[in-house]
Amino acid sequence: MRILVWGATGSVGSRVVAEATARGHSVTSVSRSGPDHLRGDASNPEDVARLSAGHDVVISATRPQDGREGELVDTAKSLLIGLRGSGVRLVLVGGAASLIVPGSELTLMESPEFPAALLPIARACAAQYALVRSAEALDWTYVSPPALLEPGTRTGRYRKGYDHLVTDAAGESSISVEDFAVALVDEAEQAQHIRQRFTVGY
């Protein structure tokens, strides 16, 4: 399978590249900078169309800097335009804040415990998801991480959810970045959630 990864130098993207490569896929890694990657800007539809041509799946794991959260929506729009009608599937890494907290009717960002400092990125992720949901002429999958996503160990194990946070017996919602990458590459291979959002956790 030919997979193109946007945001290949980031925490999630670099692990997606490693996971997909280890499985024997042909991986093209793209970044705004870095000598070992193709140069490209995911917020430019022409770059998206040009670099994605000839691939089976695009996995986008870009993340904006603090204060530039609006780039999430701009980048999603660019990906949708650049891939429209191409036959290339899009697996897009999103946010967790719009997931519903189990046992409540509130989303994570609506819960009283949600840090105010994270509201800008949370709102941007919610807008990103709303935009992607309206996309036509494109097979997309939106993947929300759990509440806690940190570097750790690859176990190859995870559980899936859809609109609710995946939590363990202690009520924690987490996964290692390595296992999150496993879930992303699994979806690239299996195409189980076309035009759907899903989430994962332990």
Residue locations for each model-derived region?
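Conserved Rossmann-fold NAD(P)-dependent oxidoreductase catalytic core, especially the SDR/UDP-sugar
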Residues: 77-120, 130, 134
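Conserved beta-loop-beta element that borders a ligand/cofactor-binding pocket
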Residues: 130-151
